Structure formats: structure tokens, C-alpha cells
């Protein structure tokens, strides 16, 4: 009997596959009696189920690598406060590609295996060490997962966030959809600065061609139903703003309810339009009956009721008038208008020490503190403060996050070029929104050649030119 026990106790040492489960089975067989051994086997039989559940975890959750909604929910967990100062190789798109979410400052967590990764970059002067640390973090995005995690072997595909400029039909349908959604905001759309539009090389002719393309796409054609219902707004001013915003990748977030919010579906940036000048606050001349005659600045001031003064300029003038010497003199010399009886009452007023002012009188306190109250008064306006507060124009490019595909060099996938043609094509690549613009203009050009009927083109083009000139007047005033 003793020999049998010794053989049993020695056998685990000789076994090559030593696991906690095997040791438990050997202990139960050699020491515990038969009744308790059965209980031990029952407990041991439950353990493989847990291990099996863990091993089946990749199979159960592997859909996350093919779910676009799950991918962008991970991208949305990154913010500028918790993930700042990272190179493009560690942008949220790359981290979310391998299943990482941002939970704390410079701290990542896997959405499947719950592994943690600290991605802090220490401020060092040695650039080579900095690059080495970045390379280590890039490797850690793939290797820091648990042993049975599926993310290193099956990351998300890049077409989740890439701009598919090689598919013109997809580019056009997405552009028209964004334009239609933005038109629902109507006059709540942000007003665009003429200098910003000019720096983007977007001319009046470009906008006219894009609007013609949208109009042609929305028309019902033979063998094809209309893509959407009629546009929510007929204002050309709304169409121009929505067209430029849609070209730069902006869309409307309907989940926000009544709030006017636009968002970027790529970098998950959300912008509240109440912080910017809106079309309803810009006083443009709506009389577009004579598009052929140019409008001079003098005519623009005569036609506009207030000579086209921006809200920020009105606030500046009101503050200048309030802080002028005449205004301050009138406020500080108001004590001269008191009657002799009132002056005597002021001199006989008891000294107020509750505020620690010593021997200063109450009138002295009021006069001494009035300049501070005047400085704060513009911020204590009534409900009209939202109409007169200085608000800047919306820049459709700078409002994107720095790693957004719309404002970075487009990297198209699925190209058929080979050899030196790949390098030549990569050299010609431009920003994402410009690549989309090329595709849209090429599509519009092909339709114009096939259908030369452009009877309504000159009238709409002149109206677009007219609005662009009015935007230029707004920028110069």
C-alpha cells in the first residue's frame, strides 16, 4: 500500500504536463478516500467549464472586430484631456483597431480580455529615445493583450475609418446624405468666414458644380427612385453652408434632440453651433433678383438696415461707449448733483465696518467699487446676451481633431497600381476632403458631358457668386 502511494506521489514529478488540474486529480486519487474523491472529481469537472468559457471568449466576442459601431464607441472613449500629445502612430483610431479603450489619462484597457496598458510618454530631450518609446508602444498595442485574446490576430479593418475614394458611388451617396441632414438645421447652420473658404481653394464655381451634382442626384431618374424627399430648406445660403460642411465630413447628430449639434463620424468630434455665428445672425441681402450686377461695399451698407455690423462689433462699440471718459465722468461726478440736504445726510451717515473698509463711507464704497462692477456688467446681461456675445465663425477644417482622416493625407485602400506607380500615386495624395472633392467634381464633369442641358446653370451660379461676395463684405467690415 505504501508503495502504491509513493508511486502516485512521484508520478506528478515525472509527468511533463503538470497543471493545477492534474495535481488536484492526483491528490484526490492518492490521498482522499473514494467518497471525497468523487466530490473532488466533481469540483475538478467544473473547472474545465470555466476554462472552456474563457477559451470560447474569442469566439463569442470576435464580432467586435467586425462591428463598426463597437469600433467607433471605443474611439469615442478617447478625449483630448485623457489622450494628449501622442504621435499619429498612437492615435485613437489605431488603438481602437486593436480593441483598446481609454479609461484614464494615458491608460488603456482591452474591451475583451480587460488587460491594461500604460502609454505615457515622458518629456525627454533625446529624440531617438522618444521614437524608441513610440515604437515600443506600437508593439504593445498588439502584444499587451492576454494570452487567449483575439485582438492581436484579428484587428478591425482599416476601411472602418478610411475614406473610400476609390468607390465614387459610395463617396457621392455619403456626401448627399450629409448635405440633406445638414439642411435640417436651416438658419442654425454656422456662418463661414470668406478667408477660410478662400484658403481651402473652394471657389464659387466649385460650389455651383457641387450643388448641381446634388440636385441631379436627388432627381428621380428612369429606372431609379428619388434618393430622398425634398430638401428641408430652399434657401441658397443654407445650401452653400451645408454643401461646404458636408464636403469637409460634417454631419448632423439627431440624437441630441433639439440642440443644434454637428459631428464628424470619423473622429467623433461633436460641436455645438451656439458657440459660433449662425446664418440667422448674419444680415445678408436676400434680394437676389439681379444676380448679374456686382454689389459694391457702399451699396451693401445702404441695403442693409444696420450697415452690416457683426455682433462682436456691436459689443465692442457698446463697451467703448461705456468705458469712454465722458461716460466715466458722468458716473463718478454724480455726487455733484446731490442737494445740500442729501450731502449733509451723507456726511452724517455712520461708518460702515462690516466690510473692513475702515473710515470710508457707504458712498465712498459705492464710488470706489463701481468701476469693477462696470467691467463685469456686460457678462450679466439678460436673455439677449446670447445674441450680442462675440462669437467667431466656424472653421470646417480646424474643428476636426488633428488625427481625423478628413484633414490628413488620404490613404486609399484597394489600389491596383504596382511598382513605381504606387510611389507616384502616394506622392499625389492630398488631404481627405480634397480627395473627396476630386471624386465629386469628376462625377459632375462626367454627367455634364453626358447631359449637356444646363439651362438653369447660369442663374444659380450668379446667385452663388452673389452670396460669396456678401461673405467677403462681412469679413472686411
Swiss-Prot record:
Phosphorylated. May also be weakly phosphorylated on Tyr residues. Its main location: nucleus. Keywords: Cell cycle, Cell division, Metal-binding, Mitosis, Nucleus, Ubl conjugation pathway, Zinc, Zinc-finger. One of its GO terms (molecular function) is zinc ion binding. GO terms for cellular component: nuclear pore nuclear basket; nucleus. Residues 382-392 have a biased composition (Low complexity). Residues 354-363 have a biased composition (Polar residues). One of its GO terms (biological process) is cell division. A zinc finger (C3HC-type) spans 95-149. Residues 370-379 have a biased composition (Basic residues). It is found in: Nucleus; Nucleus envelope. Residues 287-392 are annotated as: Disordered. InterPro entries: NuBaID_C (IPR013909), NuBaID_N (IPR012935). It comes from the Eukaryota. The keyword Cell division applies. The keyword Nucleus applies. Required for proper positioning of a substantial amount of TPR at the nuclear basket (NB) through interaction with TPR. PANTHER family: NUCLEAR-INTERACTING PARTNER OF ALK, ZINC FINGER C3HC-TYPE PROTEIN 1. This is Zinc finger C3HC-type protein 1-like. It comes from Xenopus laevis.
